[in-house]
Amino acid sequence: GLLGSLFGAGKKVACALSGLC
């Protein structure tokens, strides 16, 4: 759903910003 898509995008952004991926 939309909420799941937003959550997934948020995780990608957090991963990129943290430099852990």
UniProtKB/Swiss-Prot annotation:
Compartments reported by the entry: Secreted
GO cellular component: extracellular region
GO term, biological process aspect, one: defense response to Gram-negative bacterium
Keywords, comma-separated and alphabetical: Amphibian defense peptide, Antibiotic, Antimicrobial, Disulfide bond, Secreted
Tissue: Expressed by the skin glands.
Keyword Secreted recorded: yes
Record-annotated disulphide pairs: 15-21
Pfam families, alphabetized: Antimicrobial22
Major subcellular site: secreted
Coiled-coil features, chain-numbered ranges: none
InterPro entries assigned to the protein according to its UniProt record, in alphabetical order: Nigrocin
Similarity annotation: Belongs to the frog skin active peptide (FSAP) family. Brevinin subfamily.
Protein task: Has antibacterial activity against the Gram-positive bacterium S.aureus ATCC 25923 (MIC=56 uM) and the Gram-negative bacterium E.coli ATCC 25726 (MIC=28 uM).
Name of this protein: Nigrocin-2HSa
Native organism: Odorrana hosii
